[in-house]
Amino acid sequence: MGLLAVAESQPGSPVVEVRFDGDDDCLPIEIEGALLRIAQEALTNARRHATAHRVVLTVTFQPSTVSLDVVDDGVGFDADAVGVRGFGLTSMRGRAKQLGGTLNIDSEPGQGSAINATIPLRPGPGTAP
């Protein structure tokens, strides 16, 4: 998965750590692309708005889902107030929803932010349902 490249393409602060949990043998290209875009947007937000020093990206592969967690140590924000007008957050939510997934945001002022995108995996060609 290209998350390492995404993390390395973000110059300067914050420090980005990428973790993988599970096996990504057959991740469909449309899901990988959506997760990469969500990760890019989350990293951009952490850099521009959160003044984060550290961000941890974790991709977790389960038999029926793949999840991306992006956690930063930035200034945090009121997720309820920003959610309706934040274009980047709306874009991330739309990418997850387009693939039947969800995007959840947990943040409070002064507490950093945690973003979770969970997308269901569809059986590939020749795979038993």
PLM regions and their residue ranges:
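Coiled-coil dimerization/phosphotransfer module
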Residues: 1-129
